[in-house]
Amino acid sequence: MPYTWKFLGISKQLSLENGIAKLNQLLNLEVDLDIQTIRVPSDPDGGTAADEYIRYEMRLDISNLDEGTYSKFIFLGNSKMEVPMFLCYCGTDNRNEVVLQWLKAEYGVIMWPIKFEQKTMIKLADASIVHVTKENIEQITWFSSKLYFEPETQDKNLRQFSIEIPRESCEGLALGYGNTMHPYNDAIVPYIYNETGMAVERLPLTSVILAGHTKIMRESIVTSTRSLRNRVLAVVLQSIQFTSE
């Protein structure tokens, strides 16, 4: 079944392990918390200390609830960044809003919805592919891909249009470019521009679909499994950093 993830920026980095007991009491159930320190290199030739993140995964114990009810929260933080943390969550449990309000009250944080720009959506597509590295690009799983655009005109004379790239073409374009950890950004999107004159990052991109795997939209991501890759999480955190004008 598909899982829809929503994303919220957080004004400071949280230490969730200190508050789980209170959350258990509030929800009257056990909250399963997993804490990891992960490294997601931004440079294909290696990583730095700036590429180290703390990842919290918080799952509500739903053993006594309906099978169709579930809830998961993932937090990613890096204390060296100006915006040090964000969270994403999926699930049908009505306790999700309770958890969000508790986080604001318990830690005194400000949260805001994250909206992805076109360039970020392409980066997320790259990050969604299974373990892309310079060494294994020939072994990764490729997906038929579709980019949807929805122009906004005063009289609504233009409607949604899309570009579809078959799985074999995605693979061929990426391999033809050479070893790259960013096949969509480095090979597929430039090919679209060269062949059509359409600059994807300047068009009203509304979604990127990797068939049967991931759908990336402006305000959410839909996955086929109840998880998000570390590289996807890192791209999201990097995308919400403030930039000086």
From Swiss-Prot:
The keyword Isomerase does not apply. It is found in: Nucleus; Chromosome, Centromere, Kinetochore. Keywords: Cell cycle, Cell division, Centromere, Chromosome, Kinetochore, Meiosis, Mitosis, Nucleus. Signal peptide: none annotated. The keyword ATP-binding does not apply. GO terms for biological process: ascospore formation; attachment of spindle microtubules to kinetochore; cell division; establishment of meiotic sister chromatid cohesion; establishment of mitotic sister chromatid cohesion; maintenance of meiotic sister chromatid cohesion; meiotic sister chromatid segregation; protein localization to chromosome, centromeric region. GO terms for cellular component: kinetochore; nucleus; outer kinetochore. Present with 125 molecules/cell in log phase SD medium. Belongs to the CENP-L/IML3 family. Component of the kinetochore, a multiprotein complex that assembles on centromeric DNA and attaches chromosomes to spindle microtubules, mediating chromosome segregation and sister chromatid segregation during meiosis and mitosis. Component of the inner kinetochore constitutive centromere-associated network (CCAN), which serves as a structural platform for outer kinetochore assembly. Forms a heterodimer with IML3. CHL4-IML3 is part of a larger constitutive centromere-associated network (CCAN) (also known as central kinetochore CTF19 complex in yeast), which is composed of at least AME1, CHL4, CNN1, CTF3, CTF19, IML3, MCM16, MCM21, MCM22, MHF1, MHF2, MIF2, NKP1, NKP2, OKP1 and WIP1. Interacts with CHL4 and CTF19. This is Inner kinetochore subunit IML3. It comes from Saccharomyces cerevisiae (strain ATCC 204508 / S288c) (Baker's yeast). The lineage of its organism: Eukaryota, Fungi, Dikarya, Ascomycota, Saccharomycotina.
